[in-house]
Curated annotation (Swiss-Prot):
UniProt protein name: Photosystem I P700 chlorophyll a apoprotein A1
Annotated PROSITE patterns: PHOTOSYSTEM_I_PSAAB
Location in or out of the cell: Plastid, Chloroplast thylakoid membrane
Membrane topology, as annotated: Multi-pass membrane protein
Organism of derivation: Nymphaea alba
InterPro entries linked: PSI_PsaA, PSI_PsaA/B, PSI_PsaA/B_CS, PSI_PsaA/B_sf
EC number: 1.97.1.12
Positions annotated to bind chlorophyll a: M683, Y691
Gene assigned in the entry: psaA
Gene3D superfamilies (UniProt xref): Photosystem I PsaA/PsaB
Amino acid sequence: MIIRSPEPEVKILVDRDPVKTSFEEWARPGHFSRTIAKGPDTTTWIWNLHADAHDFDSHTNDLEEISRKVFSAHFGQLSIIFLWLSGMYFHGARFSNYEAWLSDPTHIGPSAQVVWPIVGQEILNGDVGGGFRGIQITSGFFQIWRASGITSELQLYCTAIGALVFAALMLFAGWFHYHKAAPKLAWFQDVESMLNHHLAGLLGLGSLSWAGHQVHVSLPINQFLNAGVDPKEIPLPHEFILNRDLLAQLYPSFAEGATPFFTLNWSKYAEFLTFRGGLDPVTGGLWLTDIAHHHLAIAILFLIAGHMYKTNWGIGHDLKDILEAHKGPFTGEGHKGLYEILTTSWHAQLALNLAMLGSLTIVVAHHMYSMPPYPYLATDYGTQLSLFTHHMWIGGFLIVGAAAHAAIFMVRDYDPTTRYNDLLDRVLRHRDAIISHLNWVCIFLGFHSFGLYIHNDTMSALGRPQDMFSDTAIQLQPIFAQWIQNTHALAPSATAPGATAGTSLTWGGGDLVAVGGKVALLPIPLGTADFLVHHIHAFTIHVTVLILLKGVLFARSSRLIPDKANLGFRFPCDGPGRGGTCQVSAWDHVFLGLFWMYNAISVVIFHFSWKMQSDVWGSISDQGVVTHITGGNFAQSSITINGWLRDFLWAQSSQVIQSYGSSLSAYGLFFLGAHFVWAFSLMFLFSGRGYWQELIESIVWAHNKLKVAPATQPRALSIIQGRAVGVTHYLLGGIATTWAFFLARIISVG
């Protein structure tokens, strides 16, 4: 008798042709909503169209349909990203001085944009060195291209075309997986399989293939470039991949192939998989051999992580079990029910992912300057400042987005009847304690951090420098930060005996790396000035968290409005006849949180910009004397509010204000224009709906008089629309002003 194991049941995970492709449908504005599809009666229609076009929850209640729309939209997003990348590479191929920069990256500035003199604006094409005139770019693409082994503009062309092909492929995939073969809900909820593919596939194999590229292509090409070989003489990437002898000339252990791997004699590979620490003195970037080693290690970790969860084979972790086992003696039911929340609410899922990605983006901002990963990045001060600022802003927006979607989850997806005594329920039940304590912390930090500055301004104004908090009078040294710095500076000799230097030169230890007479990085001293501004950071971050967390915890109900959940995510007030209930919706908390996020990030990027110009960036003489851009004035000037205004904002804005008539004049115009956009926002934030409705009605009267009245009735913006337009212009104007101020300054002095 033959006993067979039962045949595995094949689950059909897609529906065929669920939604027909219809261009007529797409051409009808608002086809996703009965009300909007009727067309406009009033001008509010266009606002509703924009507000609801991507709010898939408002189109349908069917979770499967919502999931498919989100999934399909992701392919569209990827298509746009590939298109953008293709454009970047195309500019590098067609309009840039990449090959010239590659031959002399210390004296030639990167440029990939040449202004066409259509209206006589050719003055913007500044001399970036090497006889090339164009706009200096600060995105870091040149440094990435060099690190990845791109040596010619032809290679950039090919990559640009490849990215276009991928963009088309993604567009097709988005259409295919919604209209032709749409996944079933069960597929979206199969978290273990998803973890398997995302961890082992995307992150594991992705890192492994990148490590392979770095070892076989980037390392040899960069070795030649560092030695001063003409890029045209360097073998092409495929020659290194196909011809092992070429690599063996640079790294002799390559001649032995995979033998050392299988005989566990891994130290043979230490030539190109290193653990040195510190920066390469030739390029001022991390050792590329360290980076290759890192990606190999990360790949192994993620390949293992991706195989820990139970998929088709009945072994491994079950995520639901892990979450339900996760409870301590004081946490009631713990994470019971969290699995159901995260598999049925995309908003809950998104909130967690945005919070983590936002935090990670801010971590990236801090590592890009302290451990500059690409060759010649550290000495390109404009790019360093831009990368820090960019990643800080993005991180701030993502974290506010996390709070927004957490609140939407609370309003739309949270079911209080099934949740009892789990962690979320317990947090909600003592939300008053959380918010009131957080409020106390904010008041304490605000008064004390600001108070230290006010004290210093007062003493300075009264001519009593000996009574100020400063490194030369009453010291407030950041002793914990200094302790962390020293621990890390001493680490290589203690915890990592194989490493020749610490993870970052910023920790201390006296090393300085300079490339082409410019400082790449050196130990960053921390003193009283940093202690003061650090507490301003603590204050602004805590206030942002207070506003956002209050919005989430009180999204469904509060003492003021017990039935808030019925009013939805955004509403202006709790109806007529209930005074004092405006600006309480979860949306309004996001709105207010954005302003404090803007405050918080502004102080961070100002601190960074001035600190680096004062204590890190500068030139080094043949005798080894470092001259910093602002001559080390941060420690004594930034300890008063007046100092920030006088020696940072005013002194450093001279470049942007005096840029007219030079190649930086576009930044001068942007500086002016962005101030205007910012001021324009105040018109929306400080005036009410009724004011505008009155004005509109008298304008409509005039149109009627002349018989030119439109069929669509004009309406004033609703309260929420006005605030949305206001905060958008406030942030756009503020960020663009900062951008123009930073870049004009750093391009002229850096």
